[in-house]
Every structure is written in structure tokens, then in C-alpha cells.
UniProtKB/Swiss-Prot annotation:
Homodimer. Keywords: S-adenosyl-L-methionine, Transferase. The lineage of its organism: Bacteria, Pseudomonadati, Pseudomonadota, Gammaproteobacteria, Pasteurellales. This is Carboxy-S-adenosyl-L-methionine synthase. Signal peptide: none annotated. The keyword S-adenosyl-L-methionine applies. InterPro entries: CmoA, Methyltransf_25, SAM-dependent_MTases_sf.
Length: 241
């Protein structure tokens, strides 16, 4: 695993964060050291796939990056005729995802597509995964994507939505941000790395509150919505059609 040192030295002109070749190369290390509970979420996606994925249905991993969630789901699917569609708009991520997925043998076909997830049709889905993806979409586009996902899910189909959250209580929000930064420092990131990455993400990642997520999911039709995992200001929700 290549170590993430992208922000370890001062950058004179710090641009917006992008999922380019350099990020794709170090992504597994970056994500493990940056998102508390990430491995637990990936494991649980497999557990949820074993329960909710139905025969002859599709599974979508929207914003699939290097395929961790795709592979977790595929390992646990126990129904025939299932196809997994992974989508990411970063060609370097897609290239590595295809290599990663092809390294593991399975009878379940996986199609990895380089495209904007807003352009993908969701059809005959028993499971859709948005694992730290929605937060990178413009806020005005989030409801329409979730509505499309709801329409494309089978009855009793599931959406797994993992996100970084913000909190309306400013003191609690500040505490959880500080705890997250402490988590990153404990994983070997310097103050400079934490600061520069935060600045790079400011314009491209806009977080919602848990309440805002729940309200929007209910508005598009989901009957059952619950937060099933949280660590500091990161977490994952399940929404059942």
C-alpha cells in the first residue's frame, strides 16, 4: 500500500482536491488514516448485501473509487443472476478499480464505468451504495439523484449512504471536528497535512446534517431510514424502500 504524503510539504498554490492520479495511487492508505470506522463500514456493506441483494437484480456502487465496497458486497452475495455496476468519474480510480476487481475470482460479473453518477440509470436494483460520495455532489443535485435511486430500487431494496456530517450545535460540531483531527494525527498525519487537506476540500465537499439527510431521504419516498454507524463526524445510514 502506497503511503499518502500528498500534503506533507508546504504547497504554495493549494488548489481544490481532485481524485486524480496521485490521489488514486495512495487512496487506500489515505482513506484508512482519514475516515474513522471506514473498515467497519466496508465489512458491514458485505453483511447488508447478504441480506438484501435478491436474485436477478443489480447492485450499484456509485462513486466506487478503487472498489472496496464493490468487493465486499460481491464476496457476500449468495443469490444467482446478480450484476454489480460500479461508477466513478475519475479515470485513474476506474483503472485501479478494474485491476483490483479482476484480481479476485467470482461468478458475479462486475462492470466498472467511468461516468458522472448523475448520468447513470438505476434499474432493477436491490442495493445501491453511496459510500462517501454524495458529499462531493453540488447540494442542489443531491435530491434528484436520491429520487432516481429510489425509483430504480425494487421494493425492500436498500440504499447505504455513508457521509461526513456536520452538526447544528456549534460546540458539538467543533468537538467532533477536533476529535477527527486528533484521529488523523494519531494515524501519522502532521498538522500541516491536516490543515492543507482541509483547505483543499473546502470548496468540493459540502456536508449535511444527519437530520437533513433523513428528511431528504423521506421526501423522495424512503419509508425506513436509520443511522446505523457513527464515529465522530462520520457515519453511515440505511434507507429501505
Amino acid at each position: 500500500m502506497t503511503k499518502d504524503t500528498l500534503f506533507s510539504t508546504p504547497i504554495a498554490k493549494l488548489g481544490d482536491f481532485t481524485f486524480d492520479e496521485s490521489v488514486a495511487e495512495v487512496f487506500p492508505d489515505m482513506i484508512q488514516r482519514s475516515i474513522p470506522g471506514y473498515a467497519n463500514i466496508i465489512t458491514a456493506i458485505g453483511m447488508l448485501a447478504s441480506r438484501f441483494v435478491t436474485a436477478n437484480s443489480n447492485v450499484y456502487d456509485l462513486g466506487c473509487s478503487r472498489g472496496a465496497a464493490t468487493l465486499s458486497a460481491r464476496r457476500h452475495i449468495n443469490q444467482p443472476g446478480v450484476k454489480i455496476i460500479g461508477v466513478d468519474n475519475s479515470q485513474p480510480m476506474v483503472d485501479r478499480c478494474r485491476q483490483h476487481v479482476s484480481a479476485y475470482q467470482s461468478t458475479i460479473p462486475v462492470d466498472i464505468i467511468c461516468d458522472d453518477i448523475r448520468h447513470i440509470e438505476i434499474e432493477n436494483a436491490s442495493m445501491v451504495i453511496l459510500n462517501f460520495t454524495l458529499q462531493f455532489l453540488p447540494p442542489e443535485d443531491r435530491r434528484s439523484l436520491l429520487s432516481k435511486i429510489y425509483q430504480g430500487l425494487q421494493p425492500n431494496g436498500i440504499l447505504v449512504l455513508s457521509e461526513k456530517f456536520h452538526f447544528e450545535d456549534q460546540n458539538m460540531n467543533a468537538l467532533l471536528i477536533d476529535l477527527h483531527h486528533q484521529f488523523k494525527r494519531a494515524n501519522g498525519y502532521s498538522e500541516l497535512e491536516v490543515s492543507q487537506k482541509r483547505t483543499a476540500l473546502e470548496n468540493v465537499m459540502r456536508t449535511d446534517s444527519i437530520q437533513a439527510h433523513k428528511m431528504r431521504l423521506a421526501e423522495v419516498g424512503f419509508q425506513q431510514v436509520e443511522l446505523w454507524f457513527q464515529c465522530f463526524n462520520f457515519g453511515s445510514m440505511i434507507a429501505v424502500k
